Regions:
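FIC/Doc superfamily catalytic core
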Residues: 1-186
């Protein structure tokens, strides 16, 4: 897809993401998205579905964003970069998904995964960046659900700057230092 085709598919002329409510004011859309996604995040945390595969990440992205965007949960089929950082080429997704599924299998077999285990998964999923929007929120919730099934809770930083720097460098050590792991109350 050309840049022009991508823009036409995903953005209104003013740069706001195309959405099911045809909201063209970016600030208004951002607020509505934030509230709607937060409600859905709480619902999933209460349900605590068991994460078994990469497909569950797609389901989460669709659940969080599908009420607002038609493309939610769909894997991207185009190249993407942010701030000079190139994400994985979409034509390599098959191998990456197999790797992630193996990684999830290893995590699910561990009695108590470490913060480094979760940081490594976050780093790998960030590099894949499978969706048009909501990669960070979907991925963090996905990993949080894995942790909950191990009696753990991950505290993500309120300020993402250091975590994003670690992700841009693919430095699991930096990423892990920005997160905290606790036992869950349940």
């Amino acid at each position: 897809m050309t840049d022009e085709e991508l823009q036409a598919k995903f953005l209104y002329d003013n740069g706001t993401l195309r959405n099911k409510f045809t909201i063209k004011n970016a600030d208004e859309l951002s607020l509505i998205e934030y509230r709607g996604v937060a409600e859905r995040e709480v619902a999933l945390l209460q349900q605590q579905p068991k994460i078994k595969s990469f497909e569950d990440l797609q389901t989460i992205n669709k659940f969080l964003f599908g009420w607002l965007y038609d493309w939610a949960g769909e894997l991207r089929n185009y190249y993407i970069s942010k701030a000079g950082f190139d994400f994985l080429e979409y034509d390599r997704f098959d191998n990456a998904i197999k790797y992630i599924n193996d990684e999830i299998g290893r995590l699910n077999k561990k009695k108590q995964p470490t913060i480094e285990d979760y940081a490594a998964l976050l780093n790998d999923l960030n590099y894949i960046h499978p969706f048009r929007e909501g990669n960070g929120r979907s991925t963090k919730l996905f990993i949080q659900l894995i942790a909950l099934h191990h009696g753990q809770v991950i505290d993500y930083p309120a300020d993402n700057a250091e975590m994003i720097a670690g992700l841009n460098q693919s430095d699991v050590g930096i990423i892990a230092k920005t997160m905290a792991l606790q036992k869950s109350a349940g």
